[in-house]
Amino acid sequence: MGSSSDIVPDRSPADDVAPVTDTKIPKEEPLTLRRTRPSRACTVRAQQRLQELQAAERKLKPPKKEYKREQHRRREEVVEEDEDSEDDDQEDEENDGDDESNPKQCVAGGSSTKIITSLVPPPEPSQMPRWNLRSMWELASVLNFLHVFRPLLKINAEFSAEEFETALLTPNDTLSDIHIPLLKAIPPVTRMALTRDTWVTVLCRKIRDCWHWVAEGDLPIVALQGREIEVYKNLDPAIRVVILKALCDIRVEQEDIRSYIDNSLKTGVHLSVFRKDRVGGDSHGVNFWYEEDPLIGHRLYREIRKAEVLKVKTKGSKILPNITYQWETVATNFDEFQDVSEKLLQSSSRIEVSLGKKLVKDMLPEIEKEHKRKEKLLKKQHRQALLLDNFVVVDGLAGRSLRDRKPVRYTFDDYDKSINDAIKITKKKHPSPEHPLHRRESARLDALANGRSTSSTHPTEPVNDTASGRSSDFADYDDFDEHRDESLDRRRRQRPQRYSATDFVETVSDNEVEFQSDDDIYGEAVYDEEYLKKRKQKKLSSGSEGDEEKGDEEYKWDEDNAEYEEEEEEEEEEDSLSASEEDSDEPRRAKKMPRRETKLRSRSNDFRPGLRRSKRATRIDYQQYEFSDSDKEATGLAKRKRFVEPDEPSDETGNGDFTMGSQDSEENANDPETKSGEEEEPRDVNDNADTTNGKENNQLNKSNGTTDQEEVEGVVGKRRYLDLNELAPVSGFDDGPSTVLKDDDKTDNS
């Protein structure tokens, strides 16, 4: 190996200016003279290494044209981002000399460099504390922990990342809502209750023993008999973040979270759920992280690794480079994500361009949707705030005027007054224990049952077979007609079905409470027989002249029945006054109200218990007359009844005829058209039978007298009643006048 003089030329200025002399001083001789002992092998090797480095530095630089050509050729041939150190040094010198306004940063990483696009603008002075928080990777770790393990942490408070940062800068209730659930799940259980005022003390006690396991440095806060609360509020926000990060690390080591992670991985959950993977980066220490949380917010982070090597002359092994990390919060909202994506798409790095495309395609649509939802929520809150402001404003300026509140009363005067008014209103109304239709029908059926009067000394007479057969046919329709009559108005409903007297017979007791006065009697009133006899005699004596001229016996029967019709109309007016006014087509009749003294006297003088018969039973029976040839078919049925059972007593047929006749009379009383028709038809018959009027009147008076006398003595005689079902049809009267003869006269003539 040659000496150093052969490798390194002498560049001293004396070589060029001084004249050449003949004497030459050898250079190695003084060295050999000064050396007293040989150099060690390690010293020789170190000296040779230093000489080689100096020789490499002193190499002549190539010409400038050749340098540019070489640089241009290398730029065209570069496919990978990794380049040689010599080329990087040359590019560094050129970039430093060309322009200093390039927005790209060149970071040395070991033996290579990386171009990084600047994405975060310098913050404003007012936003500097928040920017310092966002530059801490511990804050991003805490937010990720809260997002992943939220179901187990039992943190009910909802907050965004910005609100969390505000709470770290200025402590508020959000910090207590986060720390209290975390402290409850960390053993040991403390005796002190965890509240908003005591959680700082519990925090100091629980992190005292575990601090050196999860953090570096000294414990920033200790329990000082309550003074630690003020100390915590005065801490730097970065220290509060470090304390919370240590608390999260302690919490993640608990059994519930570890079992949750193990069970999730066994069920097929990907590991990236618990260990965040980067969304982009290269092999030179630049990594991008994306946090997607619809509740806390979407965030994009960038981590830059810096490795610095100090150029110092050292002996021995190579010195390790000093590696540092720079953490940046690149984007926190929709607008920032749009700006970052545009910058990444314009970058010269292929990795940054691919990340920009990924942001635009996958992340921005979801972020935009969440941004619109939050905007709507903010607008709604703004409208509500405006409404509240308008309510607070003084009357007349904006909003509605305030309404006066009713004075508060702690007594029950108003309540008692309302109850008393309600009681008065209900008392004014007519009490109706049952439906009016039910009440009227029951009263009529009682009247029908009372028509078959029996004394206490005589047994009940048997009912005619034909009448009982008819009544049994209609017994099945009782329930049906009750419900149908409830829904129909009296003026509009159909004729009621016929009922048998045996179904509605009730004995009347002398001690009946409901019949204390005649005003309480509903339906048909049954008067005393003596009173009815006197009233009939008065009517016959007063109307004898008119009856002799007209000879209208049926009109007399209508006058006898006038009292029944008037009572019926009076009851209808009480039960359904409104319905009768709306539906009735006929004018009202003037009602004759019976005197109360007469009713009381007739009821108190002679009241018989049991079934009674009304005086309406003593009516003219048109079955005893014969009609014209066209009317014989209608009367043939009645004649057959008289000769079917001649051995039976005459009272049975009379009772059976009375049942049908009384029922038919009630049907016709309910129908105004039938009633008018009944009044007109007998008049036509009586006008055509003038020759027999005198005899009929005499026999009618005799029959009335005899029947009244028999009822007083308790003897039941033979009676004949009006049966409208056996009347001749209307067409028989239209054909022409027909002579009517009595059955007695016909038998005498025959």
From Swiss-Prot:
Region described as Disordered: spans on this chain: 1-125, 450-505, 532-750
Keywords: Nucleus, Transcription, Transcription regulation
Residue ranges with Acidic residues bias: 78-100, 545-585
Bias (Basic and acidic residues): 55-77, 595-606, 741-750
GO BP terms: regulation of DNA-templated transcription
InterPro entries: DDT_dom (IPR018501), Rsf1-like (IPR028938)
Subcellular location(s) per record: Nucleus
Domain DDT: 133-192
Stretches with biased composition (Low complexity): 45-54
Subunit structure: Interacts (via the DDT domain) with CHR11 (via C-terminus).
PANTHER family linked: DIKAR, ISOFORM F, REMODELING AND SPACING FACTOR 1
Protein name: DDT domain-containing protein DDR4
Organism field: Arabidopsis thaliana (Mouse-ear cress)
